[in-house]
Amino acid sequence: MKVVREKAHFKRILKGFAKTLDVGVSATDRQWAVKGFIDAFRNIYTISADTKIVSKVLEIHLFPKLLEFAMNSGYRIVLADHQNYYPDMTFVSAKNESVKFAVDLKTTYCLPRFPAFCNGFTLGSHGGYFKERDKKKNIQFPYNDYAGHFCLGAIYSRTDSGGIDETRIFKIDKLKSIVSVIKDIRFFACEKWEIASDSQGSGNTANIGSIVSIKDILAGNGVFKKLGERWFDDYWMNYGEITITQEGKQRKITKLRDYLEFKGYDPNLACTVNRSKKGGPHE
């Protein structure tokens, strides 16, 4: 019961922290405050709009704030030992080191043609450490050691590439004239299961996908909203492992509605989310 209270407390303060991140990260015109890289000769090189570069630089930009938040909240941060490890950060309670929270930093961009939607996130593996929860393969601590699994996310708009010249070098006195590669950054924090979809996040890899409606992400309205984390765990641990026969054909269960029906539950417990980038509810 004490751990449940600690988890609720951590969730509350992490959400509050996410609301403060706009200060210092975005300029008054809503552009990202980071303009580029500076060398020893005071030359500024603009940042590429490549999502991996933006994600890494934004992570570096946020890290001092994260350290301050952890220290002021009674936690210490343990970073992942390897790049492909889950999670990005482990928050360990200073009072009780057995209390740990996984926090993954997630960034994605709004779709220019459908600004109510984003490109989505991958929410970690549904194989390996997710299934074998007492083992330490590709994870900082065993999955079961964590009292909660959280996302600290950023959704941003890409700046029109016509206003950015990645080959140009600026002098420091021209800093204010540099157009940032991203703008309109919105930060949020939630538990991982709250924004999960029932579909994989990236091709053939065993990653959990997120919902893509920005409104639903910010509200935590994933497909498991009516069901909770236990159903999220159960579904994704069994994703693609169960075969059913429909109309004489066999197929694997890869939809939550089918999984609920297979288990003898009302398929309508799976929340309907906006999957279509053109809008409108789709299952």
Language-model regions, residue ranges each:
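Conserved active-site neighborhood of enzyme catalytic/cofactor-binding cores
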Residues: 104
